């Protein structure tokens, strides 16, 4: 019984593997046909191992060993089928030398790492390069994107105003425009003179023809009358031309004088600005040392003018202002109350100024108040005067009303 089982192993196994190869080549399935030679070799390896094992069983002579070999053979076949096909890049020997543990594989035969590790390394290197590039751009900058910073920075708005640059430009443009206007006027005057000459020549020709036609009847009288008329017309035209020329000459002179004055004033203002750029140009220079307008010296001069009762005054403000005026000091504005007049003057000398519109308003109020100062006695006199005047007016109105009522009632009684 033992030799029957042993005679089957090596030769039949080889023939069986050959038969399987033929069947795999014939079969239309893509999985078997696409299988690499590596799979075939692994099958042959497994078959040879099973053959050796079968030889051992032949020597021992046990039927149970044959059944075990068959189960082992089936396992080896299933393992060889489970193995994935080798990648195209990996050589044949390294693929054969790789050991498989279920589905996990480790390429100890080859020096090349798996593609996932290579990709990670590449990404890391790219990231490092990008970081270094960004650091370099942060230090040096990118002129192709942002451009270089200006070598000569623009002047500060406080130190250099655009109005100063516009003034000389305006003067040059005005001069050029005036020259163009002169040229246009001269060309127009030439055209007019040409037209006049043509008209004169045509009139003369017409007159000549008329003279020839009317030569038979009163030629002498007509010619003398026409000559007189021509002379009168010529004299009138000459006078008109002289007047027109004199007007033009006067206009040109006035324009030239204006230009010269404007140029000189602009030059002077530029020179003054260069000498003292912080000087205030809006205010006219005052020879006196006092800041602000002078207070009225005589309070009695207000009798001639109608009194303004100072509706903007606060209680006690008029008396305080009167004291300032008596002392000959400047009256402080509403925003400056709490400071002495000397402190206000020192602040203004050092350059502290109110905003423009508020400054103008407060100055106007201050001027009005300075002209409206009156004492307590004057106030009482004004109040009594106002009351008397009011009573007189009321009495007049009542008397007129009584008369009207009396007339109406009297007329009714008579009827």
UniProtKB/Swiss-Prot annotation:
Localization of this protein: Nucleus
Membrane-traversing stretches: none
Acidic residues: compositionally biased ranges: 212-225
Molecular function GO terms recorded: chromatin binding; chromatin DNA binding; RNA binding
Region (Necessary for interaction with CIR1): 179-272
N6-acetyllysine: residues bearing it: 112
Native source species: Homo sapiens
Region (Necessary for interaction with HDAC3 and transcriptional repression): 273-415
Compositional bias (Low complexity): 25-34, 93-110
Modified residues (Phosphothreonine): 161
UniProt keywords, alphabetically: Acetylation, Disease variant, Intellectual disability, Isopeptide bond, Notch signaling pathway, Nucleus, Phosphoprotein, Repressor, Transcription, Transcription regulation, Ubl conjugation
Annotated GO CC locations: cytosol; nucleoplasm; nucleus
Quaternary organization: Component of the Notch corepressor complex. Interacts with CIR1 and HDAC3.
Function (record text): Acts as a transcriptional repressor. Plays a role as a transcriptional corepressor of the Notch-mediated signaling required for T-cell development. Also involved in the TNF and IL-1 induced NF-kappa-B activation. Associates with chromatin at the Notch-regulated SKP2 promoter.
Family: Belongs to the NKAP family.
Modified residues (Phosphoserine): 7, 9, 50, 64, 149, 157
Glycyl lysine isopeptide (Lys-Gly) (interchain with G-Cter in SUMO2) crosslink residues: 283, 305
Amino acid composition bias (Basic residues), ranges on this chain: 35-46, 184-208, 230-258
GO biological process: granulocyte differentiation; hematopoietic stem cell proliferation; negative regulation of DNA-templated transcription; negative regulation of transcription by RNA polymerase II; Notch signaling pathway; positive regulation of alpha-beta T cell differentiation; somatic stem cell population maintenance; T cell differentiation in thymus
Source domain of life: Eukaryota
Protein name: NF-kappa-B-activating protein
């Amino acid at each position: 019984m033992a030799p029957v089982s042993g005679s089957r192993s090596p030769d039949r196994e080889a023939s069986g593997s050959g038969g399987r190869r033929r069947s795999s080549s014939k079969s239309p399935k893509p999985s078997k046909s696409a299988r690499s030679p590596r799979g075939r070799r692994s099958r042959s390896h497994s078959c040879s191992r099973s053959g050796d094992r079968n030889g051992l069983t032949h020597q021992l002579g046990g039927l149970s060993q044959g059944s075990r070999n068959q189960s082992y053979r089936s396992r080896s076949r299933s393992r060889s089928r489970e193995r994935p096909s080798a990648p195209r890049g990996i050589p044949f020997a390294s693929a054969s030398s790789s050991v498989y543990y279920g589905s996990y594989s480790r390429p100890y035969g080859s020096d090349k790492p798996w593609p996932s590790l290579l990709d990670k390394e590449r990404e890391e290197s790219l990231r490092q390069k990008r970081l270094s590039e960004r650091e370099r751009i942060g230090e040096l900058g990118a002129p192709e994107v942002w451009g270089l910073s200006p070598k000569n920075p623009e002047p500060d708005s406080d130190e250099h105003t655009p109005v100063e640059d516009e003034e000389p430009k305006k003067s040059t443009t005005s001069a050029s425009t005036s020259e163009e206007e002169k040229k246009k006027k001269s060309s127009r005057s030439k055209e007019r003179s040409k037209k006049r000459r043509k008209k004169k020549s045509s009139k003369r020709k017409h007159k000549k023809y008329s003279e020839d036609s009317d030569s038979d009847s009163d030629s002498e009288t007509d010619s003398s009358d026409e000559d007189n008329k021509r002379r009168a017309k010529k004299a009138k035209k000459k006078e008109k031309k002289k007047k027109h020329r004199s007007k033009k000459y006067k206009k040109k002179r006035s324009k030239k004088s204006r230009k010269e004055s404007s140029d000189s004033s602009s030059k002077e203002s530029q020179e003054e600005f260069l000498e003292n750029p912080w000087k205030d140009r809006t205010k006219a220079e005052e020879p006196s040392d006092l800041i602000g307008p002078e207070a009225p010296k005589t309070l009695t001069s207000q009798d001639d003018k109608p009194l303004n009762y100072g509706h903007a005054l606060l209680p006690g403000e008029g008396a305080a202002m009167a004291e300032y005026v008596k002392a000959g000091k400047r009256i402080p504005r509403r925003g400056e109350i709490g400071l002495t007049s000397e402190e206000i003057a020192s602040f203004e000398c050092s350059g502290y100024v109110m905003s423009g519109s508020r400054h103008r308003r407060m100055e106007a109020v201050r001027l009005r108040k300075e002209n409206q100062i009156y004492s307590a006695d004057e106030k009482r006199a004004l109040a009594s005067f106002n009351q008397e005047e009011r009573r007189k007016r009321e009495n007049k109105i009542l008397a007129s009303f009584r008369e009207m009522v009396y007339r109406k009632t009297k007329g009714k009684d008579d009827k």
